[in-house]
Amino acid sequence: MATAGVAPASGIVDVNASSAIAVDKLPDEILGMRIKDDKEMEAHVVDGNSTEAGHVIVTTIGGKNGQPKQTISYMAERAVGQGSFGVVFQAKCLETGETVAIKKVLQDKRYKNRELQTMRLLDHPNVVTLKHCFFSTTEKDELYLNLVLEFVPETVHRVIRHYSKMNQRMPLIYVKLYSYQICRSLAYIHNCVGVSHRDIKPQNLLVNPHTHQLKLCDFGSAKVLVKGEPNISYICSRYYRAPELIFGATEYTSAIDIWSAGCVLGELLLGQPLFPGASGVDQLVEIIKVLGTPTREEIKCMNPNYTEFKFPQIKAHPWHKIFRKRMPPEAVDLVSRLLQYSPNLRSTALEALVHPFFDELRDPNTRLPNGRHLPPLFNFKANELKGVPAEMLVKLVPSHARKQCSLFASS
């Protein structure tokens, strides 16, 4: 199929991760509308379904709107992730030598695949690119959708684990880079596309270890959240699950992604999960240990239908005591703004981007520890900046970076 804009790579599930992968139990949520006689959904079907190393898959792309057809061959190299959704494997394009990730999921023939529909809408430097897709069949006549994605070699999860094993703190510049790019990807999907990711976690944040550019992946749980329409609450991996989800809310907002981003930032700073709950209920206990018992008003903000109130009264633990003594106060402040019980009191992704914690990234003299330049951080497109107040715009795009920003370049 024709190249679509940017999108996730991998519903990579790290089998060593201790958190539960709740979204894998929700196939009905992942598959959206019924398929009609839709030209857009046409894709070449290839026989065979092997992902064993050395297996070659041949498919064709193009052939629509006057485009020439092109044959592409992929050789499977190794599995890089698996779950009940299917498998993600690394492959090499034999024609170009390019390495890609192919996410293969069982496709219900009655429905469109929501992940594919979402990914076709996406085009952003901090979201993994969907190159094209094709269907494959097995001897049992099972149909699989194969998403051919940009390959990014590392995950934030593995980077955190690397520093943890070395008994070292992650350099603060990397914490800033990763969390800034997470917020930028969320600002884009929330404001420009109108989609909530619903499974933000370190395993779904891919990193190029040389440039430290971060890309959000795995849109298997992503959904347009419409006000007044119910959604499932059993979504998002446990350690990163917003409290309104634990309270069973079904009319939540994209603020659930902001909570998850706050949990990831806390984990980057601590070197371990901020709220490591052993179960859904225990997850809430871990949150209460830090934020204190939510007030009746806060519970009402999270889930108006929740009537039980049987929690022990625990005072909030000061954030600065959660982190090491020399932790910059700006880091602690940003965590506290992202991790609010009331969803409407959490910072938005755009508000987070202009937080003083990221001021170092806006300094034109800032470099990576190896002396190299930072990855592109301010190459905003016009749709990313639409409706942004002037005072925020000035902070968002520093003067030295305005040439690479389309809005300023055209003015």
Swiss-Prot record:
Residues 74-358 form the Protein kinase domain. GO terms for cellular component: cytoplasm; nucleus. It is an enzyme of class 2 (transferase). The modification Phosphotyrosine is found at Y234. One of its GO terms (biological process) is signal transduction. InterPro entries: GSK-3, Kinase-like_dom_sf, Prot_kinase_dom, Protein_kinase_ATP_BS, Ser/Thr_kinase_AS, STKc_GSK3. ATP binds at V80, G81, Q82, G83, S84, F85, G86, V87, V88, K103. Keywords: ATP-binding, Kinase, Nucleotide-binding, Phosphoprotein, Serine/threonine-protein kinase, Transferase. Absent in leaves and petioles while a moderate expression is seen in the stems, roots, and nodes. It comes from the Eukaryota. The keyword Transcription regulation does not apply. One of its GO terms (molecular function) is protein serine/threonine kinase activity. It catalyses: L-seryl-[protein] + ATP = O-phospho-L-seryl-[protein] + ADP + H(+); L-threonyl-[protein] + ATP = O-phospho-L-threonyl-[protein] + ADP + H(+). The active site is at D199 (proton acceptor). CDD domains: STKc_GSK3. It holds the Pfam family Pkinase. Its EC number is 2.7.11.1. Belongs to the protein kinase superfamily. CMGC Ser/Thr protein kinase family. GSK-3 subfamily. PANTHER family: GLYCOGEN SYNTHASE KINASE-3 ALPHA, NON-SPECIFIC SERINE_THREONINE PROTEIN KINASE. This is Glycogen synthase kinase-3 homolog MsK-2. It comes from Medicago sativa.
